Amino acid sequence: MFWSFNFYPAHSGGFFVKRIIHKKIGLYKLKYKCSSDYDFFWRLINKYKFKGTSTKKNELISNFKLGGFSSKYSFFQHVLEETHIRMDNGQNKIIVITIFLLRCLKNFYKL
């Protein structure tokens, strides 16, 4: 997702947030069934401009297996929910729709 305007998604397996940050930006929005973490990180980085730190390159901090919660949802459901998140957080609608269409086309031609 870096090509979508320099925004990296992250997984909660290696992400720690102080309580004061949750008080400032809010908790995870549970209305997003498969991308509430994406919304949280979007608000954290793009809306509130919080900065963080990262680990060394190629440092293992958690281990995920295939078939987790998010794999129950289709590619289209993920992209649609991320589109709603971007719109709900005030990103330019033309940019959001363009990204949505490009991601769908990219996935279609990949099949």
How would you name each of these model-derived features?
Residues 80, 87-111:
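Membrane-proximal basic amphipathic "stem/tether" segments
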